[in-house]
Curated annotation (Swiss-Prot):
GO MF term (any one): zinc ion binding
Organism: Escherichia coli O139:H28 (strain E24377A / ETEC)
Top-tier EC class: transferase
GO annotation (BP), single: peptidoglycan turnover
Name of the protein described by the UniProt record: N-acetyl-D-glucosamine kinase
Chain sites annotated for binding ATP: 4-11, 133-140
Family as reported in the entry's similarity comment: Belongs to the ROK (NagC/XylR) family. NagK subfamily.
């Protein structure tokens, strides 16, 4: 059995998958925020419960936000303070007496989608998350591409390209990002960015679901906003595709639930690509909230 953990700032979610990659059981507990020992205990107790339930010693994979293992073997995860700065993989491997694998949660999302039965035909899969932030991952022949610093797929921290500024206006504000840089595309293409753009142009502080509801009702202002957002997304994605050239792009995160994101994006891309480039297949993520657990479990299928 394959055990996949999706660990965030508020919850530890475990999913148990069989050899056919089907979910058999899941459980969630709160993430301890202050005590590393309590954090380790929470993970180990879930593993012990799964081992007992299924009568086996399952493999363990963990997806977690941040850098899973720095050069000194410690985790960097600002949203999981109890474990950040600790040798999490080594400690769990020792306590559980098995090989524990860690990866960035966005890589686990991309891996989950790449291992979907409909998508395994594609050698290079790009996962793109349009949610609270913007991130993603790259999967080549079923394996995550992580890079030296585990920042492969941090698409949200690319800066706005020149043609985006031309489109939006040269006085368009380069917002300061939480990473310390200015003009990161996350500030404009995330769910929060979607709402910020609307307020910037129309001076109304609406949230993304409210704007989308207006769009569905045929509101002209909301429709103009979505057109502008999709044009901006196409410019930024075109730059990424020119570098990555994937066979498939799978879009997840809250904004992926808005059908226009996947249905109206492909037609906008050719003008932002090289003439010889082909637009990849673009699909909405298949596995929703289970994607993180699923991808983490499948870290043991990448050998």
């Amino acid at each position: 059995m394959y055990y996949g953990f999706d660990i965030g700032g508020t919850k530890i979610a475990l999913g148990v998958f069989d050899s056919g990659r089907q979910l058999q059981w899941e459980k969630r507990v709160p993430t301890p925020r202050d005590s590393y020992d309590a954090f380790l205990d929470a993970v180990c107790e879930l593993v012990a419960e799964a081992d007992q339930r299924f009568g086996c010693k399952g493999s363990v994979g963990i997806g977690i936000p941040g850098m899973p293992e720095t050069e000194d073997g410690t985790l960097y995860a600002a949203n999981v303070p109890a474990a950040s700065g600790q040798p999490l993989r080594a400690d769990l491997s020792a306590r559980l007496d098995r090989d524990v694998r860690l990866d960035n949660d966005a890589n686990c999302f991309a891996l989950s989608e790449a291992w979907d039965d409909e998508f395994t035909q594609y050698p290079l899969v790009m996962g793109l998350i349009l949610g609270t932030g913007v991130g993603g991952g790259l999967i080549f022949n079923g394996k995550p591409i992580t890079g030296k610093s585990y920042i492969t797929g941090e698409f949200g921290h690319m800066r706005l390209p020149v043609d985006a500024l031309t489109m939006m206006g040269l006085d368009f504000p380069l917002r300061r990002c939480g990473c310390g840089q200015h003009g990161c595309i996350e500030n404009y293409l995330s769910g929060r960015g979607f709402a910020w753009l609307y307020q910037h142009y129309y001076h109304q502080p609406l949230q993304a679901p409210e704007i989308i509801a207006l769009y569905d009702q045929g509101d002209e202002q909301a429709r103009a906003h979505v057109e502008r957002y999709l044009d901006l997304l196409a410019v930024c994605l075109g730059n990424i595709l020119t570098i990555v050239d994937p066979d498939l792009v799978v879009i997840g995160g809250g904004l992926s639930n808005f059908p226009a994101i996947t249905t109206q994006l492909a037609d906008r891309l050719p003008r932002h690509l090289l003439p010889v480039a082909r637009v990849p297949r673009i699909e909405r993520a298949r596995h929703g909230d289970a994607g993180g657990m699923r991808g983490a479990a499948f870290l043991h299928l990448t050998d």
